[in-house]
């Protein structure tokens, strides 16, 4: 996979791509990336990339020319048909399923904006996806794109050391993830559930599934509307106040 990030502040990304899992993935060439300052594509003599909105109003709007030209330039370098992702609060909210969908692509282009917004023609004519990371507004699209890139890259083959890690994450099954425990088995009197020490993998799997169901019921009940439950699981959740662990 190759990722192009169009931004006015490429320096914001250096720490992200030089740390942790993303850095290892870059070193192993499991994905490549380019940071593109779309100001460099402005044909304005002062390299302006924004202007006042037609019809009046507060703030400045990103002009279409620099972004159109930047997107077309990075497309031509790879001769590809990439997904062009606009980070904006009006987009669809990022989900694990969306990340899994994007992880199947060969080329992603992220557009990170600033100011009041984008000229609508950018949305209409070059963007394939609009993504938001939540119902709040940031100063720019950079932080949001970092979140999306991280959630996508970790799903690429061999990026995570344990290939079972990603499929078992929260939301991958439609449920929140079950609780985790490690050594010691007894810490300050707080004990690990006996079933996890039993070595009976069928019982462990059953316990984990039940805990995922109960945790989802208690914390994100809306997610249960999107999955099919067995009769036994429905009985589990029909108790008055199911408790975790």
Swiss-Prot record:
Cross-referenced InterPro entries: Alpha/beta_knot_MTases (IPR029028), tRNA_m1G_MeTrfase_C_sf (IPR023148), tRNA_m1G_MeTrfase_TrmD (IPR002649), tRNA_m1G_MTases_N (IPR029026), tRNA_MeTrfase_TRMD/TRM10 (IPR016009)
One Gene Ontology cellular component: cytosol
Superkingdom, natural source: Bacteria
Chief localization: cytoplasm
The protein's role, per its UniProt record: Specifically methylates guanosine-37 in various tRNAs.
Recorded family membership: Belongs to the RNA methyltransferase TrmD family.
Protein name: tRNA (guanine-N(1)-)-methyltransferase
Biological source species: Oceanobacillus iheyensis (strain DSM 14371 / CIP 107618 / JCM 11309 / KCTC 3954 / HTE831)
Gene: trmD
